[in-house]
Structure formats: structure tokens, C-alpha cells
Amino acid sequence: MTEVRRRGRPGQAEPVAQKGAQALERGIAILQYLEKSGGSSSVSDISLNLDLPLSTTFRLLKVLQAADFVYQDSQLGWWHIGLGVFNVGAAYIHNRDVLSVAGPFMRRLMLLSGETVNVAIRNGNEAVLIGQLECKSMVRMCAPLGSRLPLHASGAGKALLYPLAEEELMSIILQTGLQQFTPTTLVDMPTLLKDLEQARELGYTVDKEEHVVGLNCIASAIYDDVGSVVAAISISGPSSRLTEDRFVSQGELVRDTARDISTALGLKAHP
């Protein structure tokens, strides 16, 4: 086994990873204490109640302040929960809101299509599966919740891409590249852009075994009340059942479902 050498005197410093984890735990503890204290507290009270050195507490507060998770009252010097915490919570609530609104429409789509229904959101340069309603068929192909999907090579991923402005779309593709997963993955830029343009016109996109061999998927974008893409809804099934002759009828069904969810989220005019 290769020996790992660390600089400094033996036993003087903890491993970097351990120190980082400890700092994170202490930062979370500070935020939790502020929440229980009604949103604000003095540095001395935080230090006392969390059994932390005053200097350490102040240093952690400054780190949290840089991330906008806390801010300091210039008059009293007390520390308050900041806007960054609200933004994180709002993102969670927003995703949960999409799912709660989408629930009845997902069930209707599952019953009408006979296929498994999925809801995914974009997380950076990936799509993440956050909701699923399995079909009743004995033969079904389902990815577990939390699965990460490539944006360019999955139905949900392409549905999250096609509404984007060209500049943002190109930026994402250049960052992620066009990895090939199956023989039918779209791996050249002109073909992918043409596919996304067609999806934009139709209001839905089709994944023809582009991510998993034997699995087809049809997806459409979901918009919020201001017209921003917040999620994608899709149906997925074995290519032996979700065949090409069903793509148009099922695509329109998925598109109409996405529009109904968008309307329920407050969208007035559909793209």
C-alpha cells in the first residue's frame, strides 16, 4: 500500500477533508441555531450555545455572510438569517410545488398512455428525475428517483433544452459535449440542433433509444407563471410497445399534459 505523507509535524493538523466536514457541520449548526432563535442572535450567544470558540464562531459567520446565508445588523451587531437561505428553501418549495400540481395530470397521462410518467428538473448540465408514476403494465422500464440524465440524450433532457435561447443552449452543449450512449445518440451538433428545433415547433421531443437501448421516451417542457422552464414531463416505455407509429399521438398527449400543468402553475400564454 502506498504511504500518504502529509506536511507538517505528525498529529499537528487534521486531514483537510475532516476539517472541511467539521466546518460544514458547524456552519449548519449555526444556521439551525439562528432558525430556532427566531432568525437572529448575537455572536456571543451563538458561541455559548453551540460550545464554539468566539473566534471560530465569528469566522464561520463571515464565511456564511459571503454566501449571503447570514447578514449582520450594523446597529446592534446581531446576526440574522440571510437571503441565500431563503433562495435555497424557495427552490425546494418550488420543486415540490411543481410535483404537487403535476400529480393529478401525471396520473391522467399514465392512464391514457399506458406508460410510466416521469418529471425531471434541470440541475446544472444534467436532468434529474424528481417524480415518477409507474404504469400498470407487467413490462416496464423505470429509472429510480434522483437518477441523472444527459440533457442531449434523453427525452426529459431535450425537453429542458429546446425552449432555451440559442446562446444558452450552445453554452451548455459546449460544456457537456455530446457523449454517445447508444448507436442512436445524437452526437453531432447540426443533427441535435435540428432535432431541438423540430421539438420546439411540435411542443414535444422524442428520445429514440438515445440513452438506453430498448427504451423510448417522449417529453415536453413545463413552464411557470412567468414563462420560464421549470421541469419536463415525459412518458417512457419499451421500444417494442412505445413504437414510432405512436409517437405523434402520444407526443401530442404529453404536450397537452405539459400545457395543462403550466396553466395550473399560472402560465397565461403558452410558447
UniProtKB/Swiss-Prot annotation:
Residue ranges occupied by any IclR-ED domain in the UniProt entry: 98-267
One GO MF term attached to the UniProt entry: DNA binding
Gene Ontology biological process terms, A to Z: DNA damage response; negative regulation of DNA-templated transcription
Outcome of substituting L215A: Reduced repressor activity. Loss of glyoxylate-triggered dissociation from DNA
Ranges of residues in domain HTH iclR-type: 21-83
Highest taxon in the source lineage: Bacteria
Alphabetically ordered keywords of this record: DNA-binding, Repressor, Transcription, Transcription regulation
SUPFAM superfamilies registered for this protein in UniProt: GAF domain-like, Winged helix' DNA-binding domain
Effect of S234 to A/N: Reduced repressor activity. Loss of glyoxylate-triggered dissociation from DNA
DNA-binding region: 43-62
Gene3D superfamilies, A to Z: 3.30.450.40, Winged helix-like DNA-binding domain superfamily/Winged helix DNA-binding domain (1.10.10.10)
Annotated SMART domains: HTH_ICLR
InterPro entries: GAF-like_dom_sf, HTH_MetabolicPath_Reg, Tscrpt_reg_IclR_C, Tscrpt_reg_IclR_N, WH-like_DNA-bd_sf, WH_DNA-bd_sf
Entry's Gene Ontology cellular component terms: cytosol
Stored PANTHER family: HELIX-TURN-HELIX TRANSCRIPTIONAL REGULATOR, ICLR FAMILY (PTHR30136), HTH-TYPE TRANSCRIPTIONAL REPRESSOR ALLR (PTHR30136:SF24)
Subunit structure: Homotetramer and homodimer. Homotetramer in its active, DNA-bound form. Homodimer in its inactive form.
Summary of the function given for this chain in its UniProt record: Negative regulator of allantoin and glyoxylate utilization operons. Binds to the gcl promoter and to the allS-allA intergenic region. Binding to DNA is abolished by glyoxylate.
NCBIfam families noted in UniProt: PRK10163.1
Identification of the protein by name: HTH-type transcriptional repressor AllR
The species this protein was found in: Escherichia coli (strain K12)
Taxonomic lineage: Bacteria, Pseudomonadati, Pseudomonadota, Gammaproteobacteria, Enterobacterales
Gene that encodes the chain: allR
